[in-house]
Regions:
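Long, low-complexity serine/threonine/glycine- and acidic-rich segments characteristic of extracellular
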Residues: 1-50, 64-67, 71, 85-171
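Short, solvent-exposed loop/turn segments enriched in Ser/Thr/Gly
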Residues: 80-82
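Surface-exposed, proline-anchored Ser/Thr-rich loop/turn motifs
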Residues: 66-69, 77, 172-188
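An acidic-aromatic loop/edge-strand motif
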Residues: 53
Length: 188
């Protein structure tokens, strides 16, 4: 949220994964600009119940998955230290709470399902918009060759979206030259 004269407001939809019993809640927040950062919280809030304005949402988040930036193409080249770069959108918001079993934002590198990469803390909502944001997560020390990456993101209504990409780590000119793409096409 934008801060003006030390004040801010923010709207969001509470995930379905809450305890619906009325009771005390807590809102934690973090703020930063170019010269200062800080955090705080309030416990002056009662949480519970549900809204009469329930939406019929059965569609998961839309995810655009890249390596390093949005110029990446499926099967493209990276170095051994690329970043997961994902753009995420959902009309009702992204669930980043991490409080419900199996509803974390997660990535699977090279089909290693026993060691998912948890990305909840790496999701950053677009300023003043809870409906979309991006994930940037640094990877390091990847071996030369072909790699796969899948990502799963949940919205606040417990719908999931998935995306998948493949990439090649190439620190060797011979490997890199064997993986040529005509992109963008046509060349200008």
């Amino acid at each position: 949220a934008s801060v003006t004269n030390g004040e801010f407001s923010y709207e969001f939809i509470v995930p379905k994964d809450i305890n619906y019993t009325y009771g005390p809640g807590r809102i934690s927040y973090y703020f930063a600009n170019d010269s200062v950062d800080g955090s705080g919280f309030t416990e002056k809030i009662i949480v519970g119940g549900s809204s009469d304005e329930v939406t019929n949402d059965e569609t998961g988040p839309l995810i655009e998955l890249y390596m390093n930036d949005s110029n990446f193409i499926f099967g493209g080249l990276t170095d051994e230290n690329p970043s997961i770069y994902a753009l995420v959108n959902d009309d009702n918001g992204i669930n980043t709470s991490g409080t419900s079993l199996g509803h974390d934002i997660s990535a699977i590198l090279d089909k290693n399902y026993t060691n998912p990469i948890l990305l909840n803390d790496y999701y950053v909502a677009t300023l003043n918009n809870y409906k979309n944001g991006k994930i940037i997560y640094p990877l390091s020390g990847l071996s030369d060759g072909n790699h796969t990456l899948s990502i799963k993101v949940w919205d606040v209504n417990n719908n999931s979206g998935k995306a998948y990409t493949e990439f090649v780590v190439a620190n060797d000119a011979k490997l890199a030259i064997s993986h040529v793409y005509n992109y963008p096409n046509p060349f200008t």
